[in-house]
């Protein structure tokens, strides 16, 4: 969050709006600090701030995040590094089920560990979508830009 503070939060949000950015993930922006000091600025410039939750996040904190969110909630699938597995563990699936049962108002999107058809299908079973980061970059690096459509369809279809 420090680079945004140095730039100026309002100037940053204004610039984001001008160039077509409508959502941000700022992992080190504390939720209470955001709510008290910056939510109105983000709203003024129509910028969504996406908060992250993880398996260790308490139900109380998740409910707080849900109450102030207006974009989506980024469900981090595990505490491990991103792009590290080919399937979700039973513990991860229990976490997804726990969050689903909370009936949150804010859509959830699952990321970290989504990179093939199996993990994509599991993610969208419990959320509104999936974020495919590391696997996408790895495919791009190994197979080039012409492989992107094939990669996406191998997951989606």
Regions picked out by a protein language model, each given a short descriptive name:
Residues 77, 101-103, 115-121, 141-143, ...:
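Expand to "…catalyze enediolate/carbanion chemistry for C-C bond making/breaking, isomerization
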Residues 16, 65, 123, 133, ...:
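Conserved, mostly hydrophobic/aromatic
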Residues 4-11, 27-44, 58-63, 82-97, ...:
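Active-site-adjacent beta->alpha loops and helix N-cap segments on the catalytic face
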Residues 1, 42-52, 100-113:
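Short beta-strand/loop segments at the ligand-binding rim of alpha/beta enzyme cores
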Residues 20-34, 48-57, 76:
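Catalytic beta/alpha-barrel core
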Residues 26-27, 70-78, 132:
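Non-cysteine beta-strand/loop elements that form the S-adenosyl-L-methionine
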Residues 57-68, 102-103, 110, 114-130:
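Catalytic cores of alpha/beta
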Residues 20-22, 45-49, 70-71, 104-108, ...:
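Short, well-ordered coil/turn segments that N-cap beta-strands
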């Amino acid at each position: 969050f420090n680079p945004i503070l140095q730039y100026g939060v309002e100037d940053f949000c204004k610039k984001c709006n001008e160039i077509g950015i409508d959502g941000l993930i700022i992992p080190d922006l504390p939720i209470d600090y955001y709510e008290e000091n910056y939510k109105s600025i983000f709203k003024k410039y129509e910028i969504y701030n996406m908060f992250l939750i993880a398996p260790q996040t308490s139900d109380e904190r998740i409910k707080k995040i849900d109450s102030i969110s207006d974009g989506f909630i980024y469900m981090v699938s595990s505490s491990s590094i991103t792009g590290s597995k080919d399937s979700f563990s039973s513990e991860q699936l229990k976490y997804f089920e726990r969050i689903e049962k909370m009936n949150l108002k804010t859509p959830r999107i699952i990321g970290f560990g989504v990179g093939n058809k199996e993990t994509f299908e599991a993610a969208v079973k419990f959320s509104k979508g999936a974020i495919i980061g590391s696997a996408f970059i790895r495919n791009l690096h190994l197979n080039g830009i012409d492989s992107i459509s094939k990669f996406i369809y191998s997951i989606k279809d």
